[in-house]
Amino acid sequence: MSHVTGVTSNIRIKKTIDDIWPLTAKRVLVRVDFNVPIQNGHITNDYRIRATIPTIQRIIDQGGICILLSHLGRPAGISMTTAVRDVRRRYHEAHFHDNKGKTAFFSVLPPEEKIKILAQSSLREEATHIMPGVKSGKTILFARLPEDEKKQLLMQYLDEKKDNGLPQLSVSAGYEEQYSLRPVAVRLAELLGQHVYFAHDCMDAKMELSRLKRGNVMLLENVRFYREEDSKKEEEREAMAKVLASYGDIFVSDAFGTAHRDSATMTGIPKVLGHGAAGYLMEKEISYFSKVLGNPPRPLVAIVGGSKVSDKIQLLDNMLQRIDYLLIGGAMAYTFLKAQGHRIGTSMCEEDRLDLARSLLKKAEDRKVQVLLPVDHVCHTEFKAVDTPVVTADADIPDGHMALDIGPKTIANYVETIGKCKSAIWNGPMGVFEMTPYSKGTFAVAKAMGDCTQKNGLMSIIGGGDSASAAEQSGEATRMSHVSTGGGASLELLEGKTLPGVAILDDKE
């Protein structure tokens, strides 16, 4: 077993939301990571939303006004200047064109504004039967009105709004429905047990924000609808950050999943405001990674899987300075096995990384890190699920076969090693766990970590991404010490890198 000395974590402990007082009547901007999977308007995994509830609840309980910012997916986005021109064009059409533009303009108003307009129309009785939500027929009803009445209603509406700023449009040139955070607002309201206000345009929300009272929560629409969020030009990120920073008094980051990004909302807002604190989720992430990379209970095992050695070079190089055991699985294991002279059939292998694999194994030997590689495999001739895959007798894989999971002997070795340890960090699956015949290795590792956490007090950390998904699917996630919400962010921390979204927050004195 290795004897690691003199290695410290480069993660500094940060001020948290508990260090900010009072929150009463303060507008608290909270950058969260609500990048959740959505299919047909339904959220299929709400873990990231649930993980932020303690921070949001703290602000509500203290009488603060909680304003949430997040991204979702990778929409094409538009620039801020394009958005301004688009809004002006829509208002121009609504005002000055007799026979076009009015229904299009009405269609992009928020649902509650549409209801108000229809309530004053000649079709008000029919309007009373329309549900207040989206896609309930409001625009279709408005389209039936005579053109003169449409114009009169919209002119009256715009005149009422002129003192408070023009109404917010629910759809702009950058809007893509599949990336809208509206379903997240609905789910968040269910979890909180209170209404969550929704601003349809994150860059044009001042009027909506002015109506919020103590204890209210508002979610702004996807910040990536604007290209400035992730612009490579600092001045563009800063321009967006200045607008968003004007919405709040205090900045809190609970978005560990995007802490590796130097974006307008992650680093730009705290730069503009001159401060930033960690939410409870961010605090927990920092705390666990600081422990495992600094002075963890020993022995410490790293379980590393995934497709490519090249994706994990920096992680392996950094962790070999810190760990006692290294368990390797997934497709990357076959590059190591071939480097040792084993036959690997048609299994995935990075031929140009064989020397690198040998050097990493030599480095582990020099540092007295015990490396365990698969000693048997679950194989098939094709990349598909079958009822009776081939299980090899040893580490060699037959010609014409590809390994798709670790075998039962390897599982036993890995489970035994995890049982010897006091700390464990896992990044990357052991096989193609999405296919049931090849999920046993990954799920067995998850169960071993869960069992040892509950029975032996193992400090177990899942490094986000596919490992977190596997822990969830296996039912073991709640038995771990910590399941990270950040795949890319946790990987960069394990590589020894500094995360911009963490570094920008105020250090705890």
From Swiss-Prot:
ATP binds at residues 312, 331, 403, 434, 466-467. (2R)-3-phosphoglycerate binds at residues 32-35, 48, 70-71, 73-74, 224, 260-261, 308. It is an enzyme of class 2 (transferase). Belongs to the phosphoglycerate kinase family. GO terms for cellular component: cytosol; glycosome. HAMAP family: Phosphoglyc_kinase. It comes from the Eukaryota. The keyword Coiled coil does not apply. This is Phosphoglycerate kinase, glycosomal. It comes from Trypanosoma congolense. AMP binds at residues 308, 312, 331, 403, 434. Pathway: Carbohydrate degradation; glycolysis; pyruvate from D-glyceraldehyde 3-phosphate: step 2/5. The keyword Cytoplasm does not apply. Its EC number is 2.7.2.3. Keywords: ATP-binding, Glycolysis, Glycosome, Kinase, Magnesium, Metal-binding, Nucleotide-binding, Peroxisome, Transferase. It catalyses: (2R)-3-phosphoglycerate + ATP = (2R)-3-phospho-glyceroyl phosphate + ADP. GO terms for molecular function: ADP binding; ATP binding; metal ion binding; phosphoglycerate kinase activity. Pfam families: PGK (PF00162). ADP binds at residues 306, 312, 330, 403, 427, 433-434, 466-467. Monomer.
